Amino acid sequence: MRRKIKLHRINMSNVVFAAISPHPPIILPSVGSEEDRKKVKNTIDALQSLGEKLKKARPEKIIISSPHSDWGFNVPLFFLAQDFEGEIKKHLTGLESPDEYFQEGKKAYNKTDKRIALIASGDLSHCLKEDGPYGFNPDGPKFDGDLIKFLKKKDIKNILKLDRTYPQAAECGLRSFSFLLGVLEASGANWQPEIVSYEGPFGVGYLVADFKI
């Protein structure tokens, strides 16, 4: 009888952690009220869990991308890397296309770096509810649903088209996510996406995703 051999994934990349994080200041204990933070408990719990995972991965460098220069960096780092003492490289995204940021992510990867953690900061649609910051637009929930669906399928091609497919979604994270995907692609990392949490109690989509490596 032939013995079954269990195959284990071998990661030859120097990327040891990668995640998508939302960045609403309201989830910070110093900003959000206890009542508001209860409404985003799933998001907070998910980020705290990934913070423990990042610590165990022992990265020497963090590359974080964000469309905002203040809370866009500070909120994810509070939960994911509060005690991190290594190098943090911040990458600010602008208005160029998601595909351009995907290519930029490829160029940003440096194989000579040792142990890298990637964080893509960004919120999903801001128009999920009538009482949300931009009211309701049907593009909002469609964008969020398709982004999650394509992430699960590792369908980068369609992810990079989402800004054109749903132009009224009022999202702020797609270019940041595209940058992370470009770095992952260039690194050769063997990654498997997991949606850790998703919710939108205030009319804005908050996604926490773990790219298992």
Model-identified regions with their sequence ranges:
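Flexible, D/E/H-enriched segments
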Residues: 5-61, 67-111, 130-213
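Short, active-site-adjacent cap segments at secondary-structure transitions
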Residues: 125-128
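Beta-strand elements within well-structured catalytic alpha/beta cores of enzymes
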Residues: 62-66, 114-122
